[in-house]
Amino acid sequence: MPAISRDEVAHLARLSRLALSDAELDEFAGQLDSILNHVKVVTEVAADDVPPMANPNAVTNVTRPDVIVPGLTPEQALSGAPAVEQDRFAVPQILGEGE
């Protein structure tokens, strides 16, 4: 006996707002039954003695060492700015007063 019936597929199709023909209902019932059987096999294979893992690859974070490098001086950083006020980038106001 299939795990999922044609009526259940029709119900799922209605919930999904899919218009399926009778042939499609029969086809999808068979496909979903096959999928559920494969899932059942996988759940039977999964053993309690196998620890769960988030990633099958044994990859660790590869980071570079922190090295202090000189940054830009304020003058260098502001040299390309179209407008500067009090050693800061000047930008147009986008919010009104009190917002």
Swiss-Prot record:
GO terms for molecular function: asparaginyl-tRNA synthase (glutamine-hydrolyzing) activity; ATP binding; glutaminyl-tRNA synthase (glutamine-hydrolyzing) activity. It catalyses: L-glutamyl-tRNA(Gln) + L-glutamine + ATP + H2O = L-glutaminyl-tRNA(Gln) + L-glutamate + ADP + phosphate + H(+); L-aspartyl-tRNA(Asn) + L-glutamine + ATP + H2O = L-asparaginyl-tRNA(Asn) + L-glutamate + ADP + phosphate + 2 H(+). Transmembrane segments: none annotated. Keywords: ATP-binding, Ligase, Nucleotide-binding, Protein biosynthesis. InterPro entries: Asp/Glu-ADT_sf_sub_c (IPR036113), GatC (IPR003837). Its EC number is 6.3.5.-. The keyword Nucleotide-binding applies. Coiled coil: none annotated. The keyword Nucleotide-binding applies. It comes from the Bacteria. GO terms for biological process: glutaminyl-tRNAGln biosynthesis via transamidation; regulation of translational fidelity; translation. Allows the formation of correctly charged Asn-tRNA(Asn) or Gln-tRNA(Gln) through the transamidation of misacylated Asp-tRNA(Asn) or Glu-tRNA(Gln) in organisms which lack either or both of asparaginyl-tRNA or glutaminyl-tRNA synthetases. The reaction takes place in the presence of glutamine and ATP through an activated phospho-Asp-tRNA(Asn) or phospho-Glu-tRNA(Gln). Belongs to the GatC family. Heterotrimer of A, B and C subunits. This is Aspartyl/glutamyl-tRNA(Asn/Gln) amidotransferase subunit C. The lineage of its organism: Bacteria, Bacillati, Actinomycetota, Actinomycetes, Mycobacteriales.
